[in-house]
Amino acid sequence: MKVRMYNVGFGDCFCLRDRKKSLLVDFGTNNSRIEGRPRREIFDLIISDLSTINSKNLLLTHFHMDHLSGLLYMMKKKDISVDFGKIYLPDVFSKKEMSRTLVLLLLADLLKESGLPSRQVSLFALVDALLENRQNVELLSRGKIFENKYQTLWPDVDIIQKETDEVYDQLSRDERFNEVMDVLLDFAEKLRKIIWSMTEEGKIQVEEAQEKISLAYVYDREFRRIKAIPAFKELLNDLNENKVNLRQFKHKISIVFQNAKDGELNLLFTGDAQPEHMRMITENYDGKLPLYEHYWCIKVPHHGTQGHYF
């Protein structure tokens, strides 16, 4: 097993390599320049390196640009073949009620305190890119084994749903925003179905129901229309004025994983997991998935920033 860490500045991009298959864990940065070079040059170098690997999959821990902007760049380049065998995503797409979580993720990017200089809505940008470059998707949640050697420790879909409902219900109490929240929920459900249709289970359901997934521009046009609704702008202003922190929901869903069998080269990758969730994982809160006594490699949350120690 080899772990390669690409220098993407304030971002994440790791490649876990063995003799059979490689797994790219995140591919993004918030920096416009890295060591004096435009980030597109760094992305091109990474893409060139990845092109030498025949069998590779990609795991996106969550939907922040410092973890996925490189993938979006890669998918937009028409002279590059996106040849991942599979893309792993956190499971916020397998059930209809998860559309509520997607609403919060969409809103999180549009708030003034989102911390995204580009103001790009990362969840929508990812769905848009996947519509143009359809991939095989597998959704990960606590307990799921993937690649025949890794074990998912987070997200826990039941806990995420509970935390989602608490915030969503609070936002829905204001009658001024009931209509626009319903519009957002309907749009989020469409996005959920797009990703779900790329999974093995979802493909079967979509074929049986004979549902049709529209082209990317249709959803882009609809999203622009929603953002132009006066009540939507009023909702964003209200959330900003009341300092409602929705950015955390991008972190709440972050994938955490380790190798499935205890050994000499134990790995623990944590994405940008929240401190309270990392404490739960460390304490083996449900008694099902204990951490190992030692690790050969630990990727700490939030790039090691002190405010996220746990």
Region spans (language model):
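Extended hydrophobic/aromatic segments used for targeting, binding, or gating
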Residues: N266-F310
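Structural motif
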Residues: F27-T29, D91-V92, P155, G271-D272, ...
